[in-house]
Amino acid sequence: MYLELFAILLATALAWDYMRKRRHNKMYAEAGIRGPKSYPLVGNAPLLINESPKTIFDMQFRLIAEFGKNIKTQMLGESGFMTADSKMIEAIMSSQQTIQKNNLYSLLVNWLGDGLLISQGKKWFRRRKIITPAFHFKILEDFVEVFDQQSATMVQKLYDRADGKTVINMFPVACLCAMDIIAETAMGVKINAQLQPQFTYVQSVTTASAMLAERFMNPLQRLDFTMKLFYPKLLDKLNDAVKNMHDFTNSVITERRELLQKAIADGGDADAALLNDVGQKRRMALLDVLLKSTIDGAPLSNDDIREEVDTFMFEGHDTTTSSIAFTCYLLARHPEVQARVFQEVRDVIGDDKSAPVTMKLLGELKYLECVIKESLRLFPSVPIIGRYISQDTVLDGKLIPADSNVIILIYHAQRDPDYFPDPEKFIPDRFSMERKGEISPFAYTPFSAGPRNCIGQKFAMLEMKSTISKMVRHFELLPLGEEVQPVLNVILRSTTGINCGLKPRVY
């Protein structure tokens, strides 16, 4: 009886799976997009049996070598394709039909809600329009002071370990600095993450970021119901961290809103709320922009604002952390490049290590910018981007079926020898002004591109230039510790740390 019932259920599942995939298979074949063998129900899942997070990149390179830069995928109940083809990437990133994020980002909803990273359609468009002024030139100019002050704190704390022989993992170091920067610029508050790393909010951000990275790579942690079943204590820990972050953000929003309302009630305007106790104008934060904004004449709710502030806390600290750490790693292992950066920094900023930087001075660090761009080419902070195609869509001359999940392989596209000769080599001069225009814009997309490009990329570049130039002014970076082992995740990390040594500079 049970055997017969099982046979009926299995036959039904197989028939359903075949019918569901038949149209996809036909359309992908007609589009010339091939992929590895797909099995009933499980699709390509057997490919992952002998893989780990640190071998996934190599596996994807092998698939590209065998099937080309567009690879059909079927994973359990999902169908779609991966692409490292710059022309296909251009078609996807440029189209209004393909701006919807796929379920790759569902793990972030508990923390970020429906903020700019995840939101779709009209809500995304309206929020993007509201937030864009937060990155106006004048506001960014004010933020440089924060970058400079927090990076100064970072280097002062590093002197204790700068003995020329201690291995330093730069990821947690850069993480606390980036957290201080984004908290002050997004919320207008000092959380002193570098000085008080045990502060509840700091611990909660660190915990949530690490646990989300783990959930991304562990199939049993992908869904909340499997987390409840197999990892109930971890889920409770994550939920506690998210609650702590939400409580802190809500308290800051409430306090700032009350300040704004009081200023208006006293006969002033919204700008009056930006004055401190002695009448000096405070630095405007992203939170201030959101509090002063309206949609259809109505102000944003506290929940609306929290979604965006939390989104910037996540995107604004983890991505720059990865880039700063990998750039330090590469400078330590390429002394000739480090020497050029150091000389440029001395020429532009001078020999006073305590002299503050300005937006103008950072703009003159042209070679350092090339170094950061080349670091982002080799180690993009966001190694993959997920999109969802909800209706039949022509992309790069290929008709792609509806209900397709697309994974854009940024890491692989930026190591494409068709666009980057000697792609594994660290060559910052690829991005020099003399070679401007040689790189196809969609072969290099560390900040994404098109309508859903990174809204804070100028902010990020200024922060990275400020932080790394400060490091180079104070220390010689040394090639100590294990080589990096990049691991596929929402944000690029390394299983071996991102290591270097430091020796104080004397000049």
From Swiss-Prot:
Gene name per UniProt: Cyp4d14
Matching SUPFAM superfamilies: Cytochrome P450 (SSF48264)
Co-factor(s): heme
Gene Ontology cellular-component annotations: endoplasmic reticulum membrane
Primary role: May be involved in the metabolism of insect hormones and in the breakdown of synthetic insecticides.
InterPro entries: Cyt_P450, Cyt_P450_CS, Cyt_P450_E_grp-I, Cyt_P450_sf, Cytochrome_P450_Monoox
Organism: Drosophila melanogaster (Fruit fly)
GO MF, one annotated term: oxidoreductase activity, acting on paired donors, with incorporation or reduction of molecular oxygen
Amino-acid positions noted as binding heme in the UniProt annotation, renumbered to this chain: E315, C454
Entry's EC annotation: 1.14.-.-
UniProt-recorded name of the protein: Probable cytochrome P450 4d14
Main location: endoplasmic reticulum
Pfam (any one): p450
Protein family per UniProt: Belongs to the cytochrome P450 family.
